[in-house]
Amino acid sequence: MTRCDDRPSASQISITHVTQGSCVASASPNEVYATILGSCICTCMCDPVAGVGGMNHFLLPSADVEDAQHLRYGSHAMELLINALLKLGAARQRIEAKIFGGAMMTPQLGAIGQANAAFARRYLRDEGIRCTAHSLGGNRARRIRFWPKTGRVQQMFLGSEDVVPNEQPQFRLQGGAGDVTFFDRHNNAEMPDPIKEPR
């Protein structure tokens, strides 16, 4: 069968699983980034003109949004991602972001998910990076897939029977915009778009 477009086939797709503390970026149309989020935040950034994008995955060490040391950790996660995109040819003024996660998963983590979500939104606002979509909070884990070349994102809410990676606050990171599609875990059908546009 001859393909009539230039989209990569399933056999060409490379899926990279992005774990807590990681930051990745690519300009490849064959690359897909995947992660599972509870209280953690992932930021999907893309320069749609340059065709480059990346994802980070982090959890602030506490729910104290005034703790300067903890906020530096979150800022470092964001700066790593931005710098990775710039090295691939992105222009900072064109970078767009989508943010996901920040759920309240366990009583032990308390309001840390809410604090992570608040940090991410504030950081983007303060840095002048346009947030084109976000899905934050709640009490369910999320599975995210991100196509860095185009900025396309898929989100699926997970059920209680799904295994969510153990999230632990940490101080160190590992290693140096298209459509958003939402899916329901139980019927795998596309959901009405619940994206909240930033105010």
Curated annotation (Swiss-Prot):
Keyword Hydrolase recorded: yes
Pfam families (UniProt xref): CheD (PF03975)
Domain of life: Bacteria
Enzyme Commission number: 3.5.1.44
Role description: Probably deamidates glutamine residues to glutamate on methyl-accepting chemotaxis receptors (MCPs), playing an important role in chemotaxis.
HAMAP family cross-referenced by the UniProt entry: CheD
Protein family membership: Belongs to the CheD family.
Protein name: Probable chemoreceptor glutamine deamidase CheD
Species of the source: Cereibacter sphaeroides (strain ATCC 17029 / ATH 2.4.9)
Gene name per UniProt: cheD
